[in-house]
């Protein structure tokens, strides 16, 4: 059921009172692969500390729909988020299948889909005021396709986007019109809410 949920919905949730060995789960999901380390380390605690937060996720602020780490090459394909103890009352994790949303978007907004397929967006993490400074930049279209013109990934993380490559004013307007139509579309697509 766990794998079927990942294949069908793009995620799976395990509710248990047991303390799990996260490395066993990762090795079971992706045998013979080592988990990818990030700027935060291989694993890390997310602790709500507004005064010293180096990431919006470390606060109690609402996070808009996004994908984590789009500036990595390659970006993570499977993420394991493990909540041992929720520090705050309330709050919710909202998950969306952006791949499915992109397929629906292509049907409803074919011109805008093509624009987001053809224009390059810059995803970046530039942060020097930290113990391990980072300057990561990755350029990708929002709707990434392979050589056979098949959609293989949706790149969506508005709050880590940098400048788009130079384009003329008409193209710039066209891009941002499509961008905001996609933003509204993804906001309205069905989602799953996980209460922690």
Q: Which role fits each region the language model picked out?
A:
Residues 1-195:
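Active-site environment of non-heme Fe oxygenases that use a 2-His-1-carboxylate facial triad
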